[in-house]
């Protein structure tokens, strides 16, 4: 068995710290988790933490970026698998996939709070995963309804949709305000439809 390269070892330590922080934040909450908790669970020295992250807020930001990106890519992949040819139904399916994911993963939604965010997804994807963001934007621009827009405007629309969905999911699923997500879906979908027309 080949030895892991130094780069692979560093990536593994960073992943171990992220996984440890994820579990600590879920179990104890962000406020009650200490850096000592994170490094103890990851079985690394405290100094190792600071090689990768500035502080607890920095590791949380990395977690939110990672989680948000995975959710968006998952929703995009599931939408692609449905082979929906009409624009609006495809966008609504994409949104519904995100909503249903959050409904099934309330603890995760509590963890990332209102930070499910398109800019964070873009930040993650720009770190070497640009293919996914380009595929999503190309797909969005391929619909006749979007051909009138340039890539920047399409990006802004996608940004607004993801921000809106993230905020509404947190308020309605976690806080049950102003109503349950199932009650709000029709209104949310009408808002998205207006944004896309």
Regions found by a protein language model. Give the residues of each.
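Alpha-helical DNA-contacting segments of helix-turn-helix folds
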Residues: 53, 60-70, 74, 112, ...
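Short hydrophobic/aromatic patch on the recognition helix
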Residues: 43-53
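Short secondary-structure transition hinges
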Residues: 100-136, 174
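Secondary-structure edge/capping motif, primarily at the C-terminal ends of alpha-helices
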Residues: 75-83, 109-116, 169-176
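Hydrophobic/aromatic-rich alpha-helical bundle segments in the mid-to-C-terminal region
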Residues: 144-191
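Basic, helix-initiating cap at the start of DNA-binding domains
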Residues: 1-28, 33-44, 58
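Hydrophobic alpha-helical connector segments
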Residues: 62, 76-104, 158-161
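Amphipathic alpha-helical packing segments from all-alpha helical-bundle domains
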Residues: 73, 120-146, 155-159, 186
């Amino acid at each position: 068995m080949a030895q892991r390269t130094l780069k692979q070892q560093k990536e593994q330590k960073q992943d171990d710290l992220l996984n440890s922080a994820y579990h600590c934040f879920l179990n104890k909450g962000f406020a009650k988790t200490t850096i000592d908790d994170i490094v103890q669970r990851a079985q690394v020295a405290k100094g190792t933490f600071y090689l990768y992250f500035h502080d607890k807020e920095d590791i949380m930001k990395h977690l939110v970026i990672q989680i948000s990106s995975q959710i968006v890519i998952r929703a995009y992949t599931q939408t692609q698998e449905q082979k929906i040819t009409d624009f609006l139904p495809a966008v609504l399916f994409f949104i519904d996939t995100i909503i249903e994911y959050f409904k099934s993963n309330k603890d995760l939604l509590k963890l990332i709070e209102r930070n499910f965010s398109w800019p964070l997804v873009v930040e993650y994807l720009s770190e070497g995963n640009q293919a996914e963001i380009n595929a999503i934007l190309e797909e969005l621009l391929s619909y006749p309804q979007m051909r009138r827009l340039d890539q920047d405007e399409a990006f802004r629309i996608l940004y607004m949709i993801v921000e809106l969905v993230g905020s509404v999911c947190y308020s309605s699923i976690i806080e049950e305000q102003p109503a349950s997500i199932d009650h709000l879906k029709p209104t949310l979908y009408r808002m998205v439809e207006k944004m896309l027309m």
